[in-house]
């Protein structure tokens, strides 16, 4: 059984074709600059690149080219589109309606449209991608897998904001959380590595990329997470501010005479480690600048590490203890220095790190010592595989 996994952004599209017998990706691809001059599709099969450069005015044209690349006689991996048993779509926001993945039909599409107001940047391209696939592959079942779904198990006192209750009732203003598919995947892998049932464990998962969030997992369920109503909340990130005093936004509008759009740009695109360092949103650049003595770069890293450490401490309290901490995503998987700095100061939990093991980059590995009271893992995330597994489970019933 082969499943196509699609992740549509506003001007890009990532995809994988996964053979579910072996759970191996037969092909991985990226389409860039959709609707912009210089559109390009890059597909990788066994390390070999296949590139298509031609105008792609919309996502439908992009998906046409994806299917063309997959069945290409020389560079493709299937002989016919009928070999694709189902398509799994990453959808950022499922609102309160969806606590798990769902088979897509017209009713689901209407619900996704209703969620656009909750994710105006992310859900529209997700919807466009689904519509394009449904048009091009009308007989192939489609499944929506939501970033928010895993966090629908948050207790009401964790997701409710201390605002007038009618804002929640009438407008859906509450904590939703994101990166759910990643948190779900790495917590389950951690339990496998420990040889224990996830339902018997207390796990804190740290998805640390340009966007970053933490999740507290108890009895296999998300009980707390750092992102909120939007992916802006929580930790300091690459370009996002994370948690700040909300009155700062009023100050920016009233005193600095900034428009709502200008404030939005500042807090989403000009803040985080980029804003503090003035160097970059890429942690490799910031680490390099800090090593060369750039004080603002060092401060940016210190602030970032502090917010992660602070949140791990809070989630240990939420869980009443912790059995395992997992690092994943770009920074979590590849920066030994960041992992070390984040864990520095958590010795009271009984965490002991093996310095040699911690030097590993991008590998699935336990980096804690044998006598560490808390197990610490680096687990490369695989959201595409999780989407494919959900798609198989729903379509094979």
UniProtKB/Swiss-Prot annotation:
* Reactions it catalyzes: acetate + ATP = acetyl phosphate + ADP
Q: What GO MF annotations does this protein's record show? A: acetate kinase activity; ATP binding; magnesium ion binding
- UniProt KW Transferase keyword: yes
- Residue positions annotated to bind substrate are 90
BP-aspect Gene Ontology terms: acetate metabolic process; acetyl-CoA biosynthetic process
Query: Would the keyword Kinase be found if you checked this record's keyword annotation?
Result: yes
Q: Where does Mg(2+) bind?
A: 7, 383
Q: Where is this site: Transition state stabilizer?
A: 179, 240
EC id: 2.7.2.1
Gene3D superfamilies, alphabetized: 3.30.420.40
Kindly list the positions annotated as binding ATP: 14, 207-211, 282-284, 330-334
Q: Which residues form the active site?
A: 147
Record text on subunit structure and interactions? Homodimer.
Q: Which family does it belong to?
A: Belongs to the acetokinase family.
- The name under which this protein is listed is Acetate kinase
What is the originating organism of this protein?
Clostridium botulinum (strain Hall / ATCC 3502 / NCTC 13319 / Type A)
Highest classification ranks of the organism? Bacteria, Bacillati, Bacillota, Clostridia, Eubacteriales
């Amino acid at each position: 059984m082969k499943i196509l996994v699609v992740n549509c952004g506003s001007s890009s599209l990532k995809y994988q074709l996964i053979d579910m017998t072996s759970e191996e990706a037969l092909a991985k691809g990226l389409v860039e600059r959709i609707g912009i001059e210089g559109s390009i599709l890059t597909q990788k099969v066994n390390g070999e690149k296949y590139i298509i450069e031609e105008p792609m005015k919309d996502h439908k044209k992009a998906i046409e080219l994806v299917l063309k690349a997959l069945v290409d006689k020389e560079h493709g991996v299937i002989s016919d589109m009928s070999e694709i048993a189902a398509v799994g779509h990453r959808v950022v926001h499922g609102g309160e309606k969806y606590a798990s993945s769902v088979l897509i039909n017209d009713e689901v599409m209407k619900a996704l449209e209703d969620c656009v107001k909750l994710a105006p940047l992310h859900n529209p391209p997700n919807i466009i991608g689904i519509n394009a696939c449904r048009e091009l592959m009308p007989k192939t079942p489609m499944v929506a897998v939501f970033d928010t779904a895993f966090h629908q198990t948050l207790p009401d006192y964790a997701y409710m904001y201390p605002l007038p209750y009618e804002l929640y009732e009438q407008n859906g203003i509450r904590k939703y959380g994101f990166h759910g598919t990643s948190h779900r995947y790495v917590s389950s892998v951690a339990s496998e590595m420990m040889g224990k049932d996830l339902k018997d464990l207390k796990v804190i998962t740290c998805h640390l990329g340009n966007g970053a969030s933490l999740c507290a997992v108890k009895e296999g369920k998300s009980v707390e997470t750092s992102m909120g109503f939007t992916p802006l909340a929580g930790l300091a990130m690459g370009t996002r501010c994370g948690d700040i005093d909300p009155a700062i936004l009023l100050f920016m509008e009233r005193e600095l005479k900034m428009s709502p759009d200008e404030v939005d740009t500042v807090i989403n695109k000009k803040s985080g480690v980029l804003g503090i360092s003035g160097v970059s949103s890429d942690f490799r650049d910031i680490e390099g600048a800090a090593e060369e003595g750039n004080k603002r770069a060092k401060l940016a890293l210190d602030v970032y590490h502090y917010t992660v450490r602070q949140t791990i401490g809070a989630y240990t309290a939420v869980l009443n203890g912790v059995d395992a901490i997992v690092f994943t995503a770009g920074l979590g998987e590849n920066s030994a220095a960041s992992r070390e700095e984040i864990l520095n100061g958590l010795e009271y939990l009984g965490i002991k790190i093996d310095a040699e093991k911690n030097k590993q980059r991008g590998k699935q590995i336990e980096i804690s010592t044998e006598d560490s009271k808390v197990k610490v893992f680096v687990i490369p995330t695989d959201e595409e595989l999780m989407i494919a597994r959900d798609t198989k489970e729903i379509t094979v019933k």
